[in-house]
């Protein structure tokens, strides 16, 4: 079963574009919950995602309720600096589960009510107190690759796939 990145009302097109590229490169599904803080025609969104958009498994939703209704049965983790558990302490290794990593708006995060109702599934990435938060696209990549690492990288190519040879065999 696949891994999923869920963006709740993302505001910065470059972040969403970068995340889409990570999703294309890791075979991770991308879910966007409206309203978005930008147009999907935004040049920053397109530039950050480069020409990989055709390889992104992308779904849109008009609300959190619609998202949860259409993805019932998944295992949901809410990524927040307030999480009581560290992301790397969770087991994502079961290939038969759908793991959903839910991220909030860049400026305000996820709704407090959602976090309070799911306290045990709220995860954080350790950081210093010198910053308010980590960048959304970097955080999404950390979670995507941690899940894939635990799944032995699934179907990803684990050998270089380029014609260019740098190292001697």
From Swiss-Prot:
Its main location: cytoplasm. One of its GO terms (biological process) is wobble position ribose methylation. InterPro entries: Alpha/beta_knot_MTases, SpoU_MeTrfase, TrmL, tRNA_m1G_MTases_N. S-adenosyl-L-methionine binds at residues 79, 104, 125, 133. It is found in: Cytoplasm. Transmembrane segments: none annotated. It catalyses: cytidine(34) in tRNA + S-adenosyl-L-methionine = 2'-O-methylcytidine(34) in tRNA + S-adenosyl-L-homocysteine + H(+); 5-carboxymethylaminomethyluridine(34) in tRNA(Leu) + S-adenosyl-L-methionine = 5-carboxymethylaminomethyl-2'-O-methyluridine(34) in tRNA(Leu) + S-adenosyl-L-homocysteine + H(+). GO terms for cellular component: cytoplasm. Keywords: Cytoplasm, Methyltransferase, S-adenosyl-L-methionine, Transferase, tRNA processing. Its EC number is 2.1.1.207. One of its GO terms (molecular function) is tRNA (5-carboxymethylaminomethyluridine(34)-2'-O)-methyltransferase activity. Belongs to the class IV-like SAM-binding methyltransferase superfamily. RNA methyltransferase TrmH family. TrmL subfamily. Could methylate the ribose at the nucleotide 34 wobble position in tRNA. This is Putative tRNA (cytidine(34)-2'-O)-methyltransferase.
